[in-house]
Each structure stands twice: as C-alpha cells, then as structure tokens.
Amino acid sequence: MDARLLEILVCPICKGPLHYDRAAQELICNADKLAYPIRDGIPVMLVDEARQTVEGTPVDPAGPAGS
C-alpha cells in the first residue's frame, strides 16, 4: 500500500484516520470499529463493503501491521 495514499485516505463515515493491516489487507477505522477491504491493491472505501471489527479490540497502528 502506497504510504502517500494512506496519508490522504480517511474513514468515509467519521473522516478519521485509517490504519493499514497488512496481514488482513484492510484499512481499519478504530473510531467506528470498521475494516475496509483492500482488493487487488485498491482500497474499497464503501460503507456497505466494510466489516465490523471485534468490539474492544482496536488495531494498534504501531503494531506489526501498522502503517
């Protein structure tokens, strides 16, 4: 995932930052607890395509899958 693209993409709901989960190929919004898929290297930023993340388990942007 291109670092420049990650800098400009935001959650379509809250406009908050997204964190790249390399292993799952998803962009995560911790505020809304949503994960947006990345398909063939293209982020799918449609709310209908997002999945709910596990409640109470925020993605750590500094972790192994962090941006």
From Swiss-Prot:
One of its GO terms (cellular component) is cytosol. InterPro entries: Trm112-like. SUPFAM superfamilies: Trm112p-like. It comes from the Bacteria. It holds the Pfam family Trm112p. Belongs to the UPF0434 family. This is UPF0434 protein Bcep1808_2639. It comes from Burkholderia vietnamiensis (strain G4 / LMG 22486).
